[in-house]
From Swiss-Prot:
Gene name for this UniProt entry: xylD
A Pfam cross-reference name: ILVD_EDD_N
Catalytic reaction equation(s): D-xylonate = 2-dehydro-3-deoxy-D-arabinonate + H2O; D-gluconate = 2-dehydro-3-deoxy-D-gluconate + H2O
Quaternary structure annotation from Swiss-Prot or TrEMBL: Homotetramer.
Binding annotation for Mg(2+): E96, D133, E467
GO biological process, one term: D-xylose catabolic process
Annotated function: Catalyzes the dehydration of D-xylonate to 2-dehydro-3-deoxy-D-arabinonate during D-xylose degradation. Can also dehydrate D-gluconate, with similar catalytic efficiency. Has weak activity with D-galactonate, D-fuconate and L-arabinonate.
Entry superkingdom: Bacteria
Deletion consequences: Deletion mutant cannot grow with D-xylose as the sole carbon source.
Entry's EC annotation: 4.2.1.82, 4.2.1.39
Cofactor(s) the protein needs: [2Fe-2S] cluster; Mg(2+)
Entry protein name: D-xylonate dehydratase
Cross-referenced SUPFAM superfamilies: IlvD/EDD N-terminal domain-like (SSF143975), LeuD/IlvD-like (SSF52016)
Entry keyword annotation includes Iron-sulfur: yes
Native organism: Caulobacter vibrioides (strain ATCC 19089 / CIP 103742 / CB 15) (Caulobacter crescentus)
Length: 595
């Protein structure tokens, strides 16, 4: 990674059109004038040095990313020392745990705001600060649309959580404790105590939830410095990584290496392979598709199918045992990518922000901790990729095979002669309010041969698509020790959940997808061997039910929700704003003057 300031090829950066434009000296004066009120000099802005934006996602309302309020000074130091001029600006907040009705609304909203900032202001390159789930794809989508040099800096996971000498992972402990509470095994106070124990420091989720998955994806795509994703937020290496990232973005600005130079089809295939091997979040599916679409790359169901046979080699909750600190010490994402490279499951010749190929970045990155990162041919589990399903209820859905536990496998997938095939009676809920109201209703007669179905949870129905598919069984089953039932829905589930749900079903119920005509009591047949999921309902009955119309969804509550509902795609195509994907390489043309 280059650090010397000499040997750089001089460039006229786009910011010069604002700050040093001899054809419009009056406009130059206007643009310069107000920046001086906080002490920056006109000589700095007219020096020809690149203006490096720092897209600040940290705030008090975004606690997973709040570490960036401290890290930003090290980013600034790196930029200054490498010969750039830093300019920090705020990004629309995204916080999965707290945002109602769902933070899925915020990914595209953050994307829109960031596109306007990067395109309309004198920014030559950008450091994308990331952490919580959707901050990573939102930033990458925007930087790709504008297509200025960009680099991703994760804030890193929290330290490992401990409760009574037991590792407790953020998010995952919520779903597991919720079941224990319903079964009468713990009190409400113990529930809160376990949850608090899982969050001992600054940082994002310390499990292999969506946050850790997407920051590892940024590395697999080649958009982060090697080893960036997994460094825990409080570690000294995190500040050092922030400094190095600040340095490197200046080199990228001079070299004019842009996202579209890096984000090839092969780069996205690398990301998909990484998600499988790490037991990553199912939310990676719409996010990877969305990033790819904004890069002009098509990712289809076949790309996910191609990675299905990749084994689970990362022993990290929710699919495994350990948490973020141990994963970092075991080598993090580079060690996982190294394993994939050795087996020919990674494109090693792709370009990355280091200026080197992926193969060059991974030299010497083999793990020394085989309790955390298993050998490829001695994995934690076989076939850990997302299982893609289709049938008369939807054209596309996925199932996270890496979290299929022994209890679930024995009960549903081990019938002699019918391994991997099961039938279940559908219990249909219209949204999570309906689920919470009726799940313990004795009239439903829910037993272990039922499948819980939730609809109205997709991009249009919710709106935004909600993490509600990982429904737990009714209390009477939990008290019998039955901790999970098959679940299905047109929404999503938390990446920290350990439920082998069928989710992201597209098209969703709210636009007439097959779940809209499903009824409680119908039999659903699921064949994991062929990737089929069908309701055993005859065509005449289906046609008659369709005449009843689509189940009602909640009213739109905000202007943005109205815009979102009018333009968002389905989860199989990334949940993007369909009108936005046609806008690419915006920085190739400067915006017109404002006066």
């Amino acid at each position: 990674m280059r650090s010397a300031l000499s040997n750089r090829t001089p460039r006229r950066f786009r910011s010069r059109d604002w700050f040093d434009n001899p054809d419009h000296i009056d406009m130059t004066a206007l643009y310069l004038e107000r920046f001086m009120n906080y002490g920056i000099t006109p000589e700095e802005l007219r020096s020809g040095k690149p203006i490096i934006g720092i897209a600040q996602t940290g705030s008090d309302i975004s606690p997973c990313n709040r570490i960036h309020l401290d890290l930003v000074q090290r980013v600034r130091d790196g930029i200054r020392d490498a010969g750039g001029i830093p300019m920090e600006f705020p990004v629309h907040p995204i916080f999965e745990n707290c945002r109602r009705p769902t933070a899925a609304l915020d990914r595209n909203l953050s994307y829109l705001g960031l596109v306007e900032t990067l395109h309309g202001y004198p920014i030559d390159a950008v450091v994308l600060t990331t952490g919580c789930d959707k901050t990573t794809p939102a930033g990458i989508m925007a930087a790709t649309t504008v297509n200025i040099p960009a680099i991703v800096l994760s804030g890193g996971p929290m330290l490992d959580g401990w409760h009574e000498n037991e590792l407790v992972g953020s998010g995952t402990v919520i779903w597991r404790s919720r079941r224990k509470l319903a079964a009468g095994e713990i009190t409400e106070e113990e529930f809160i105590d376990r949850a608090a124990s899982s969050a001992p420091s600054a940082g994002h989720c310390n499990t292999m939830g969506t946050a850790s998955t997407m920051n590892a994806v940024a590395e697999a795509l080649g958009l982060s410095l090697t080893g960036c994703a997994a460094i825990p937020a409080p570690y000294r290496e995190r500040g050092q990584m922030a400094y190095k990232t600040g340095q490197r973005i200046v080199d990228l600005a001079y070299d004019d290496v842009k996202p579209l130079d890096i984000l090839t089809k092969q780069a996205f295939e690398n990301a998909i392979a990484l998600v499988a091997a790490a037991g990553g979040s199912t939310n990676a599916q719409p996010h990877i598709v969305a990033m790819a679409r904004h890069a002009g790359v098509e990712i289809t169901a076949d790309d996910w199918r191609a990675a299905y046979d990749i084994p689970l080699i990362v022993n990290m909750q929710p699919a495994g045992k350990y948490l973020g600190e141990r994963f970092h010490r075991a080598g993090g994402a580079p060690a996982v990518l190294w394993e994939l490279l050795q087996q020919g499951r990674l494109h090693g010749d792709v370009l990355t922000v280091t200026g080197k190929t992926m193969s060059e970045n991974l030299q010497g990155r083999e793990t020394s901790d085989r309790e955390v990162i298993f050998p490829y041919h001695e994995p934690l589990a076989e076939k850990a990729g997302f299982l893609v399903l289709k049938g008369n209820l939807f054209d596309f859905a996925i199932m996270k095979s890496s979290v299929i536990g022994e209890e679930f496998r024995k009960r549903y997938l081990s019938q002699p002669g019918q391994e991997g095939v099961f039938e279940a009676r559908a219990i249909v809920f219209d949204g999570s309010d309906d689920y919470h109201k009726r799940i313990n209703d004795p009239a439903l007669e829910i037993d272990e041969r039922c499948i819980l179905v939730i609809r109205g949870a997709g991009p249009i129905g919710w709106p935004g698509s909600a993490e509600v598919v990982n429904m737990q069984p009714p209390d009477h089953l939990l008290k019998k020790g039955i901790m999970s039932l098959p679940t299905l829905g047109d929404g999503r589930q938390s990446g920290t959940a350990d439920s082998p749900s069928i989710l992201n079903a597209s098209p969703e119920s709210a636009i007439g997808g097959g779940l809209s005509w499903l009824r409680t009591g119908d039999t659903i047949r699921i064949d994991l061997n062929t990737g089929r999921c069908d309701a055993l309902v005859d065509e005449a009955t289906i046609a008659a039910r369709k005449q009843d119309g689509i189940p009602a969804v909640p009213a739109t509550m905000t202007p943005w929700q109205e815009i979102y509902r009018a333009h968002a795609s389905q989860l199989d195509t990334g949940g993007v704003l369909e009108f936005a994907v046609k806008y690419q390489d915006l920085a190739a043309k400067l915006p017109r003057h404002n006066h």
